[in-house]
């Protein structure tokens, strides 16, 4: 019998269009409310079925991935193997193009891609409770990345409500400075059981636009919320402020803010040509930065 062909999945970049921190729970985790979209830039994960679990990493940003044992692809696969008896495994190959520790869920998207590949190989549903539990145990952003579709995300990241986003022209910029999520939450400074000031307005999230709403409709509502991690992240890495300034000064920009815990920032535009023109200017002005022009959806 011929060997099973390789399976391929993309790990699309996650972008937090808004991110409100409700507070820090007694167990130390933070309750969040976030509108999450996904970009058209992605890592690529391949699975060669059969044999023991392996991971090889290549690509322009492979060196930033660190040790294989610490990679979330490896962690997710091992946890699923513990949860599902006789799980078929294989050799993963990761083509890494997204920045690491960048606020766009690159590692989480890769882990989610690994779970989707293993689900395909083992005829598991993405709604399988074992897979869902493993996704959350791997990382707070992995559940939303598992489905890779726009959602209103609450709790620590496990409560997902699908949203109908229009295709939004965007520019994403990372200054090639890693920012550790734990450091940003530490800088936020909430004690266990403490609510963020103003959090009462977060608990009842805005009424998000319905299917068919325009980019302008979404921008209008998104302007009423924010990313509560932006200020503490900028205290850690002030260059984030420079990135936001470059985006906000670009022609045609509708909204610009930081994604996740940084340092990647994004801007939304009314037309693809505006996004591409803005990206070209930022590349010229800041040749050391990572810049992507594309769409969010």
From Swiss-Prot:
TM spans, by residue?
none
The family database entries (Pfam families) matched by this protein are listed as:
GHMP_kinases_C (PF08544), GHMP_kinases_N (PF00288)
BP GO annotations: isopentenyl diphosphate biosynthetic process, methylerythritol 4-phosphate pathway; terpenoid biosynthetic process
Which pathway is it part of? Isoprenoid biosynthesis; isopentenyl diphosphate biosynthesis via DXP pathway; isopentenyl diphosphate from 1-deoxy-D-xylulose 5-phosphate: step 3/6
Q: Where along the chain is ATP bound?
A: 99-109
User: What InterPro entries does UniProt report for this protein, alphabetically?
Assistant: GHMP_kinase_C_dom, GHMP_kinase_C_sf, GHMP_kinase_N_dom, IspE, Ribosomal_Su5_D2-typ_SF, Ribsml_uS5_D2-typ_fold_subgr
Similarity comment: family membership: Belongs to the GHMP kinase family. IspE subfamily.
Q: What is known about what this protein does?
A: Catalyzes the phosphorylation of the position 2 hydroxy group of 4-diphosphocytidyl-2C-methyl-D-erythritol.
Matching entries from HAMAP family are given as: IspE (MF_00061)
Q: What is the protein's given name?
A: 4-diphosphocytidyl-2-C-methyl-D-erythritol kinase
């Amino acid at each position: 019998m011929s060997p099973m062909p390789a399976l391929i999945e993309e790990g699309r970049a996650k972008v937090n269009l808004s991110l409100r921190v409700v507070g820090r729970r007694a167990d130390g985790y933070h309750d969040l409310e976030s509108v999450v979209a996904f970009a058209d830039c992605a890592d690529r994960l391949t699975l060669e079925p059969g044999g023991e679990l392996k991971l090889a990493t290549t690509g322009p940003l492979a060196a930033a991935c660190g040790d294989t044992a610490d990679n979330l692809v490896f962690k997710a696969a091992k946890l699923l193997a513990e949860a599902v008896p006789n799980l078929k495994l294989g050799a993963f190959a990761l083509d890494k193009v997204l920045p690491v520790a960048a606020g766009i869920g690159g590692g989480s998207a890769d882990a989610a891609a690994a779970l989707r590949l293993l689900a395909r190989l083992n005829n598991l549903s993405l709604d399988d409770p074992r897979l869902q539990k493993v996704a959350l145990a791997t990382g707070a952003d992995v559940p939303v990345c598992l489905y890779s579709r726009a959602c209103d995300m609450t709790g620590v990241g496990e409560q997902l409500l699908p949203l109908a986003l229009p295709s939004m022209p965007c520019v994403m910029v990372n200054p090639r400075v890693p920012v550790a999520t734990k450091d940003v939450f530490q800088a936020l400074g909430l004690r266990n059981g403490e609510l963020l000031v103003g959090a009462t307005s977060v608990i009842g999230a805005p009424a998000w636009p319905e299917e068919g709403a325009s980019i302008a409709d979404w921008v209008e509502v998104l302007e009423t919320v924010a990313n509560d991690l932006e200020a503490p992240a900028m205290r850690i890495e002030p260059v984030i402020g420079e990135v936001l300034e470059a985006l906000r000064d670009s022609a045609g920009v509708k909204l610009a803010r930081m994604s996740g815990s940084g340092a990647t920032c994004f801007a939304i535009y009314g037309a693809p040509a505006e996004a591409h023109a803005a990206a070209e200017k930022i590349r010229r002005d800041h040749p050391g930065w990572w810049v992507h022009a594309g769409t969010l959806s």
